Amino acid sequence: MSSLHIAHITDLHILEENQLNLGIDVRENFIKILKYIKADGTINKIVLGGDLGHDDPSEEVLLWIKSQLDQTKIDYRIIPGNHDSSQKLAKVFNLETEMEEGRLFFWDELDFGKIFYLDTSNGDLPMHQLAWVEEECGQSYQKFLLFMHHPPVLGNVHLMDENHALENMNQVQKILRNINNIQGIFCGHYHNERTIRLYNHMVMITPSTFAQIDDQSEIFNISSKTIGWRKIIWDGSSLSTYVKYL
């Protein structure tokens, strides 16, 4: 494989069948996004970046999400968000062997680099996961990508920064500061698009497929029902990425 074309989708917040989320048909949004990804014609990996469901979704919700992904015939990976249960995701998506200390942790090894999929579902990033990333990066000249639900930075979204930011952000930043070959850190959680520099890393926050929120509000106040997904093109030396809105 000369290059990887990734579709990053995050913050779906899928509810039970025929249920709307704040008046929004989140299932239809997800189906619409997948249709656009299929029509793109170049995507060879989909990454779901967490908050697949809303408030510990049922297995039925997760099975529906899985069925939609399976229909694309595109390879996919999933990571949990704070609204998800890692245990349920592991069961439904056959990831039991990727559980470690109650959290999901796995990676893809490519000819030109490695992708780590991290678990911040409890609000923090387990330090044993980050220690493994640090060790792997320190032993290789290859480049790496990280996918995690919570950004390791503040995102200038008032509600999220004040109430729902990564709990052990300072510890995580301290370790990331000493790693030089992470080419991109891709996150969700903030229901907004952001690109933020952290030391020598670029942290890229992908907008939600549910809705975007007012970045000045103290409550969850929808500012836009426009949904988006991120396309990432990576070959181990160069990386390009942009968000597509629907």
Predicted features by range, described:
Residues 15-18, 54-57, 82-89, 123-125, ...:
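Active-site environment of divalent metal-dependent phosphoester hydrolases
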Residues 10-28, 54-56, 85-101, 160-161, ...:
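Acidic/histidine-rich helix-loop elements
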Residues 11, 46, 51, 65, ...:
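Divalent metal-coordination and catalytic microenvironments
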Residues 1-64, 138:
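N-terminal active-site segment of His-dependent metallophosphoesterases
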Residues 24, 32, 175, 197-246:
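Binuclear metal-dependent phosphoesterase catalytic core
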Residues 3-16, 112-121, 145-147, 202-207, ...:
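Active-site-proximal beta-strand elements of phosphoester/diester hydrolases
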Residues 33-46, 114, 124-202, 238-240:
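His/acidic metal-ligating clusters that form di-metal
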